[in-house]
């Protein structure tokens, strides 16, 4: 049997992906309307979108698809990227950004030198009034981390299918035996663990997902049930 080989993932990339999770949402207001900016993971690996625009922001460089429409929804005035880019125009645009977005991104301005570091992509959704926009954003992992840590984003959660089950071994005790002792065991032999996880009343502890939980076993109709009551904290966690 060949060993399972997992691809190596950069630690910063893994951290950014984990913080993005199932998605993060940020509420804001613009042009007198309540709005919401949402970042979501890509459904599949995708390269940088054609026609996207690199922009310099306070948290780092961002690559945006459909940048004109996206940025226009983040403030009180429409944005155009056509024609000659003048400093006064971008200054006005930044002044009319939603205060929430301005604290996060301003100053926003064109970026002429594309970053050479690998980027991480995500989907962008904006809802404002009756308008809705879907776009893509790419950024380096450290820029995405700064983006997610520089405002009061709200993590999105996914409903877990009730039919989904997780199998975990129930360890009732532990002991060490030599090979000779194991070979000598016969059906019906009684083995007493040196370290017991449960007592004779069915009360004990279960290690699950790196945590320890107080547990109680019950038997009904020839079936064994296990009930977790609360998490047991280790002394160093206080």
From Swiss-Prot:
Keyword Signal applies: no
Subcellular location: Cell inner membrane
Main location: membrane
Keywords linked to the UniProt accession: Cell inner membrane, Cell membrane, Membrane, Virulence
Region (HrcQa-C): 66-238
GO cellular component: plasma membrane
Magnesium among keywords: no
Recorded topology in the membrane: Peripheral membrane protein
Domain notes: The HrcQa-C domain interacts with the hrcQb C-terminal domain.
Subunit text: Interacts with hrcQb.
Summary of the function given for this chain in its UniProt record: Component of the type III secretion system, which is required for effector protein delivery, parasitism, and pathogenicity. Probably participates in the formation of a C-ring-like assembly along with hrcQb.
Official protein name in the record: Type III secretion protein hrcQa
Organism: Pseudomonas savastanoi pv. phaseolicola (Pseudomonas syringae pv. phaseolicola)
